Curated annotation (Swiss-Prot):
Name recorded for this polypeptide: Uncharacterized tRNA/rRNA methyltransferase MUL_4155
GO biological process: methylation; RNA processing
Family: Belongs to the class IV-like SAM-binding methyltransferase superfamily. RNA methyltransferase TrmH family.
E.C. number: 2.1.1.-
Domain of life according to the entry: Bacteria
One GO MF term attached to the UniProt entry: RNA methyltransferase activity
């Protein structure tokens, strides 16, 4: 009868046809039970797509500083706390000799609800990569850069404006020293490019002796365009370069000014130099060819401050 496979004398063979493979009997399927559907490529750790996605996640966003910074030293830490810089933790070395600065830092941190952690000095050395910390370190979130328009507006509100822009300055110690000089000579702030420039890091904080806590630093996507915008609003753009055409003795510092500082090696870039109304230099009597960028900036700022006092 049709459909009746149990014919008398019939013998079921292990394969249906010659050459066909025999199935696993469901063993493989049962082995996959409970594992769910096959994950997509980017979710499988060893798949190239997953490796590319992981590398993209590790890559920092352009122009941003996403890591927590550590401010070292008693003066910088105290200046940050006095200025109310948001902080996540204060580390103090066990057994460190306290002075007024350390005592005030601990008191201010406690009043602000900042966790205070006492750690062995060796741990603090390791955490700060053996940089000079004087027994105290403050963790702060990434620096909150000002917008160039806001920086200029604040400077114009308290005339005459005095600003400094940095071109090709890659050493954070130079940035910190210039921020300190700007604060010392009555300047209003510092402008840096978003790329290929030093950032306000812990090293810059340390070199500024805490001045970075009260001196705004703005970051421009395009330095040349930002300087042109400032020039359109009445600010004189004065470049500072060893090959400048004008000595600082002949500089008129009475107008709103932004001093653009080039690096000691490269000087001012071509487009930035073309944007300047004039380029000044610091005359030197000795055989030294050029000054460190932060030293040269301090000399010019001191000259402008002298003129404005008289």
């Amino acid at each position: 009868m049709a459909g009746n496979s149990q014919r008398r004398g019939a013998i079921r063979k292990s394969g249906t046809k010659k050459g066909t493979s025999v199935g696993s009997g469901g063993q493989r399927r049962r082995g996959l039970e409970g594992r769910g559907p096959t994950p997509s490529a980017h979710m499988r750790p060893n798949h190239p797509a997953a490796k590319r996605a992981k590398a993209q996640q590790r890559r920092p966003a352009r122009g941003r500083t996403d890591e927590t910074e550590t401010v070292l030293g008693r003066n910088p830490v105290l200046e940050c706390l006095r200025a109310g810089v948001p902080s996540t933790a204060l580390y103090v070395a066990l057994g460190v000799e306290a002075d007024e600065r350390l005592t005030e830092s601990v008191s201010r941190a406690a009043d602000s609800g900042i966790p205070i952690l006492e750690v062995p000095r060796t741990d603090l050395d390791r955490m700060t990569a053996n940089h000079l910390h004087q027994g105290i370190a403050l963790q702060v979130p990434p620096y909150n850069y000002a917008h160039p328009d806001d920086l200029l507006a604040a400077a114009l509100d308290t005339p005459p404006a005095l600003l400094v822009a940095l071109d090709n300055i890659s050493d954070p110690r130079n940035l910190g020293a210039i921020v300190r000089s700007v604060a010392a000579f009555g300047g209003h702030g510092v402008l840096i490019p978003q790329r290929r420039s030093a950032s306000v890091t812990a090293v810059a904080w340390r070199t500024s002796a805490g001045a970075a806590a009260r001196m705004p630093v703005a970051r421009a996507t395009n330095l040349t365009r930002a300087l042109k915008d400032w020039a359109d609003r009445g600010v004189r753009v004065v470049g500072l370069d060893a090959g400048g055409d004008t000595a600082i003795d002949d500089l008129d510092g009475s107008d709103p000014i932004v001093v653009v500082v080039g690096s000691e090696g490269k000087g001012l870039s071509r487009l930035v130099r073309q944007t300047c109304d004039e380029v000044v230099s610091v005359p030197m009597a000795g055989p030294t060819e050029s000054l460190n960028a932060s030293v040269a900036a301090g000399v010019v700022l001191a000259e402008i401050a002298r003129q404005r006092r008289t």
